[in-house]
C-alpha cells in the first residue's frame, strides 16, 4: 500500500516537471516561427520597394 502512494507521488512530481519543460520548449519554437515570419515580412517589403524603383526607372526610360 505504501508503494502505491510513493509511486503516485513520484508520478505526480514527474508530470508537473515535464509539463513545465514542455511549455518552455513550445515557447521557444513559437518564437523561432515568429522570427521567421518577421524576416519574411521584411524581405517582402524590401523586395517590393526594389521592384517599385525598377518600375519607375523603366517608366522614365520609356519617356
From Swiss-Prot:
Cross-referenced PROSITE patterns: CECROPIN
Domain of life: Eukaryota
Keyword set, alphabetical order: Amidation, Antibiotic, Antimicrobial, Immunity, Innate immunity, Secreted, Signal
GO annotation, cellular component aspect: extracellular space
Record's signal peptide: 1-23
Modified residues annotated as Arginine amide in this record: 62
Compartments where found: Secreted
Pfam families per the UniProt record, alphabetical: Cecropin
Principal localisation: secreted
GO biological processes: antibacterial humoral response; defense response to Gram-negative bacterium; defense response to Gram-positive bacterium; defense response to insect; defense response to virus; innate immune response; response to Gram-negative bacterium
Family: Belongs to the cecropin family.
Protein task: Cecropins have lytic and antibacterial activity against several Gram-positive and Gram-negative bacteria.
Protein name (Swiss-Prot/TrEMBL): Cecropin-C
The species this protein was found in: Drosophila erecta (Fruit fly)
Gene: CecC
Amino acid at each position: 500500500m505504501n508503494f502505491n502512494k510513493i509511486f503516485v507521488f513520484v508520478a505526480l512530481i514527474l508530470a508537473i516537471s515535464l509539463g513545465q519543460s514542455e511549455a518552455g520548449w513550445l515557447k521557444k519554437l513559437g518564437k523561432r516561427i515568429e522570427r521567421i515570419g518577421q524576416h519574411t515580412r521584411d524581405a517582402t517589403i524590401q523586395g517590393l520597394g526594389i521592384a517599385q524603383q525598377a518600375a519607375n526607372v523603366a517608366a522614365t526610360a520609356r519617356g
